[in-house]
Structures are given as structure tokens and as C-alpha cells.
């Protein structure tokens, strides 16, 4: 009996497409998805009892591995006396305090429930603070399913081949300007044309939602320069790369200070969580201090705060975790490149710390959305199915990132490289 198929088929009766997030349907790779039952460390198990070495990690959050003992214990302990109050708690102060005291350029922070909430709220705050309406986002970058972001978006929008999104009125995107990632001249032209109306730029400082694409430090400096010149805010969307490429996130890669930063994924320890923070003078424009209104019934709830606090403290107190992830990440990257070269396989590997993407292409580098769109989707599909059959859970999309955790070992990397070497292309 195929329990995976049985559960997925029944799910389709009650949930659109059988899923609660489109990429989980495995539609782009043409098979039914495994239905996951349990996970521990770097391993997960499906309903048929198949085990996989997991390189998806819930799309990034599980940097400590699945069911980390300290995170689980924190959740259990908190749940014995509190779940949700819709009121202030000491736990939300504890998490806010460690974040503000250990992260760069975060004087104050506001907790929300998801990455989408964090980014849409940060953009609203930027508009309220500057009294301007237009926002620049970059083609291929995904900032959640907020209407104003669903234009030239990455992630599932790109995976599912959706040119836009039905249900998004033209009015909702008229103030969204599209920049080209790593193209200084094009962004400069946007400011020359619309500069007095631009409230800010939102950018993934390490793009992960069109696959991993690195930001040129020179390009980032230009964004800061333009924002300063036109009195706009620079917003780093670190929902994915925050706490992943380094404890302090992608800010460690650039000599550039953002005005606002958004977080989610890792900071919630695997539970629904998000946050946005920045300079005090900006954050104090939020209600109840200022006129920018944002609220949430479940924001800062004790269970999530306890999981987030356990995760953040563990990462902060153990910098060697990032050394380990860099070591095995470098080994994986170099091994894949060496095998591809030996096979004569057109491949670009983009990696930053514990996030990585394989682009099947004859290009020498992949540095923007247009480069990503030229990649060989059919070859990726064959690669994905090959690796799944070898016992590896990797993203079912060429436009997503693979992730590493502190629980991945050199043995896991060796097994991945062995499986990749047997891929015939």
C-alpha cells in the first residue's frame, strides 16, 4: 500500500491541489509528493517509511536540525502554563532584547506571524515614515504573497510558471517598480525617473527565491547611495538569509547599513513567526507611538517566542555552528563542481554559507532573474528525481535553495556527492 499516494489523493478532496503551499504539490517535477511523518536531525521519514537526508529543512528554518532537543524542551515547558493570551509576556521581551542587543542596525523590533507579514509591514512603515508611495523590488525576489509583491516574483510563482497572480488589481501594483538584480544603471534610472516618489527599496541581500543569487557589494553600495540621495529607506529582507549565512545575517557581507530588516523562518525555531526592526526613529512611527497601524492577535505568543528564544540563544552562543556549516557547504560545492566538470555538465553552483542552488546552464555565472530563466528545467527535473530515488530530499524546483543544518555531517555530504556522480544528466 502506498500511504503517500493515498493520503495525497484524499488531501486533494479537502485542500486545493492537496496542499497548503503550492510548491509542496511537486507539480513542477511531475510526481506525487512524499507525505512526511517525522524528522530528527538531518533526517526525515515519509508515511511509507522511506528515509531521506533532508536538504530542504522546512524551506530553511531548521538550521539546528529537526526536533532539536532544546527547542522541543522550551516548547513543552512553555505549553504547560501558556499558549496564547493576546497580551504582553516576558518571553516576547526576552526575544526582542536578545535580537536588538546582538543584531546590527536593529534598535527596536516588532513581532509578527510570518515573513509575508514582516515584509508587508516594513513596506507600510517605510511609506508612512517617508510620506511617499513607490517601492522598488527586484525581478525574481520573493517577499511573500502580499499583492504589491506579486509582480516578477520568484519562489512558487516562478516554480508554478505563473506570469502574474489573478486577484491582484492593477491598482495594487501601480506603486511597485521592478529593478534588475545587480544592475546599477537600471536602478539609477528608476530613481532618476521616480526618485521623489520612492519610499524605499526592498531586497533579498542574498537572493534565495530565484535560487541563490549573490548580490555584488558594489551594487549594494549603490542602493545605499541612491536611498540616501533621494531620502528613501533601504529594507533588507532577511527572512531566508537571516541567521543562516551568519548569525547576523547578510549584513555581515556588506559595508552597508539597512534602515529596516525583516526576519522569519529560523528566528521562529520552526514555528510561525516573523519580525521587522530597524532604527529607533523609524520604528517609533508604529502604533501606538505613531500613525502607522499594524497589529496581530497571535503576534508574540508564548509558544513561538519560546521556540525562537531557544533557537536564537543557541545560535548566538555557538558560533562554531556556522564554521561547521561553511566547512561542509564548501565541500559540497567543490565536489559538485568537480563532478560536473568531469562529466562535461553545464552547471553553475551558487552558494552563500548554508544555502545553495545548482543551476543547469551553460552560462558562466548566474547573477539575475534573466540568467535564472535560461536554465534547463528538464535536466533539473531528471536530477531531482534521481536524487529523490537515492534518498535525498531536495527542493522540487530549480528556483529554490538547498539548505544545510548543524546536524548534517561530512558523511551526508559524501553520500550526496556519490549520488550526484551517478546522475547521467
From Swiss-Prot:
InterPro entries: 4pyrrol_synth_GluAld_NH2Trfase (IPR004639), Aminotrans_3 (IPR005814), Aminotrans_3_PPA_site (IPR049704), PyrdxlP-dep_Trfase (IPR015424), PyrdxlP-dep_Trfase_major (IPR015421), PyrdxlP-dep_Trfase_small (IPR015422). It comes from Clostridium perfringens (strain SM101 / Type A). One of its GO terms (cellular component) is cytoplasm. Gene3D superfamilies: Aspartate Aminotransferase, domain 1, Type I PLP-dependent aspartate aminotransferase-like (Major domain). Homodimer. It is found in: Cytoplasm. The modification N6-(pyridoxal phosphate)lysine is found at residue 265. It comes from the Bacteria. Keywords: Cytoplasm, Isomerase, Porphyrin biosynthesis, Pyridoxal phosphate. This is Glutamate-1-semialdehyde 2,1-aminomutase. Its EC number is 5.4.3.8. Its main location: cytoplasm. It holds the Pfam family Aminotran_3. Belongs to the class-III pyridoxal-phosphate-dependent aminotransferase family. HemL subfamily. Pathway: Porphyrin-containing compound metabolism; protoporphyrin-IX biosynthesis; 5-aminolevulinate from L-glutamyl-tRNA(Glu): step 2/2. SUPFAM superfamilies: PLP-dependent transferases (SSF53383). The keyword Cytoplasm applies. GO terms for biological process: protoporphyrinogen IX biosynthetic process. One of its GO terms (molecular function) is pyridoxal phosphate binding. It catalyses: (S)-4-amino-5-oxopentanoate = 5-aminolevulinate. The keyword DNA damage does not apply.
Amino acid at each position: 500500500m502506498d500511504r503517500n499516494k493515498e493520503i495525497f489523493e484524499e488531501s486533494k478532496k479537502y485542500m486545493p491541489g492537496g496542499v497548503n503551499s503550492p510548491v509542496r504539490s511537486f507539480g513542477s517535477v511531475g510526481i506525487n509528493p512524499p507525505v512526511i511523518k517525522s524528522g530528527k536531525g538531518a533526517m526525515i521519514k515519509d508515511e511509507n517509511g522511506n528515509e531521506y537526508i533532508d536538504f530542504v529543512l522546512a524551506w530553511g528554518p531548521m538550521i539546528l536540525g529537526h526536533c532539536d532537543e532544546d527547542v522541543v524542551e522550551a516548547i513543552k515547558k512553555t505549553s504547560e502554563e501558556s499558549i496564547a493570551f493576546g497580551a504582553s509576556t516576558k518571553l516576547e521581551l526576552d526575544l526582542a532584547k536578545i535580537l536588538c542587543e546582538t543584531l546590527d542596525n536593529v534598535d527596536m523590533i516588532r513581532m509578527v506571524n510570518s515573513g509575508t507579514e514582516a515584509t508587508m509591514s516594513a513596506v507600510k512603515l517605510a511609506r508612512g515614515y517617508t510620506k511617499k508611495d513607490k517601492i522598488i523590488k527586484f525581478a525574481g525576489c520573493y517577499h511573500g504573497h502580499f499583492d504589491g509583491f506579486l509582480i516578477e516574483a520568484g519562489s512558487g510563482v516562478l516554480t508554478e510558471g505563473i506570469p502574474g497572480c489573478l486577484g491582484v488589481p492593477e491598482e495594487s501594483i501601480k506603486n511597485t517598480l521592478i529593478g534588475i538584480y545587480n544592475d546599477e544603471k537600471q536602478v539609477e534610472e528608476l530613481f532618476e525617473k521616480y526618485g521623489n516618489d520612492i519610499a524605499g527599496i526592498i531586497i533579498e541581500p542574498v537572493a534565495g527565491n530565484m535560487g541563490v543569487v549573490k548580490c555584488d557589494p558594489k551594487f549594494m553600495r549603490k542602493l545605499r547611495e541612491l536611498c540616501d540621495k533621494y531620502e528613501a529607506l533601504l529594507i533588507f529582507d532577511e527572512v531566508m538569509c537571516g541567521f543562516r549565512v551568519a548569525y547576523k545575517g547578510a549584513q555581515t557581507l556588506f559595508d552597508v547599513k539597512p534602515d529596516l530588516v525583516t526576519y522569519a523562518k529560523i528566528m521562529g525555531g520552526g514555528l510561525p513567526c516573523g519580525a521587522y526592526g530597524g532604527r529607533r526613529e523609524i520604528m517609533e512611527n508604529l502604533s501606538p507611538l505613531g500613525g502607522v497601524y499594524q497589529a496581530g492577535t497571535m503576534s508574540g505568543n508564548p509558544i513561538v517566542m519560546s521556540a525562537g528564544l531557544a533557537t536564537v540563544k543557541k545560535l548566538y552562543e555557538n558560533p562554531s555552528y556556522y564554521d561547521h556549516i561553511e566547512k561542509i557547504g564548501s565541500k559540497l560545492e567543490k565536489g559538485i563542481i568537480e563532478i560536473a566538470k568531469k562529466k562535461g555538465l553545464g552547471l553553475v553552483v551558487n552558494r552563500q554559507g548554508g544555502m545553495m542552488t545548482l543551476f543547469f546552464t551553460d552560462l558562466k555565472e548566474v547573477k539575475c532573474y534573466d540568467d535564472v530563466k535560461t536554465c534547463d528545467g528538464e535536466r533539473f527535473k531528471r536530477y531531482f528525481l534521481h536524487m529523490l530515488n537515492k534518498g535525498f530530499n531536495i527542493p522540487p524546483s530549480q528556483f529554490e535553495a538547498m539548505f544545510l543544518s548543524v546536524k548534517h555531517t561530512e558523511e551526508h555530504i559524501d553520500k550526496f556527492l556519490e549520488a550526484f556522480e551517478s546522475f547521467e544528466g
